[in-house]
């Protein structure tokens, strides 16, 4: 598929670049949401210290990966 050229001679990002950008944006949003929800749920369970950091970090990575994957799929569909 030929690459479209913008009005000033700039080429548009490739489909892979769009999927990659979708994943990165989704991962960032998922990490932020995971930090909020993970902190709340870990504090509710009474975690403190190293256990709290581990629980929040795990929740951040899980929600970041999940939301990033869905955003990447959505951007791939739009290509």
UniProtKB/Swiss-Prot annotation:
Report the subcellular localization. Mitochondrion inner membrane
Matching Pfam families: Romo1
How does it sit in the bilayer? Single-pass membrane protein
Give yes or no: UniProt keyword Transport: no
Q: Which domain of life is it from?
A: Eukaryota
Q: Does the keyword Aminoacyl-tRNA synthetase apply?
A: no
Q: Which UniProt keywords apply?
A: Antibiotic, Antimicrobial, Membrane, Mitochondrion, Mitochondrion inner membrane, Transmembrane, Transmembrane helix
TM ranges are 23-43
Region of interest: Sufficient for antibacterial activity:
42-60
InterPro entries (alphabetical):
Romo1/Mgr2
Q: List the GO cellular component terms.
A: mitochondrial inner membrane; mitochondrion
Instruction: Give the record's GO biological process terms.
Output: cellular response to reactive oxygen species; defense response to bacterium; positive regulation of reactive oxygen species metabolic process; replicative senescence
What broad class describes the main subcellular location of this protein?
Answer: mitochondrion
Which family does the entry's similarity section mention? Belongs to the MGR2 family.
Q: What does this protein do?
A: Has antibacterial activity against a variety of bacteria including S.aureus, P.aeruginosa and M.tuberculosis. Acts by inducing bacterial membrane breakage. Induces production of reactive oxygen species (ROS) which are necessary for cell proliferation. May play a role in inducing oxidative DNA damage and replicative senescence. May play a role in the coordination of mitochondrial morphology and cell proliferation.
What protein am I looking at? Reactive oxygen species modulator 1
Q: Which organism is it from?
A: Xenopus tropicalis
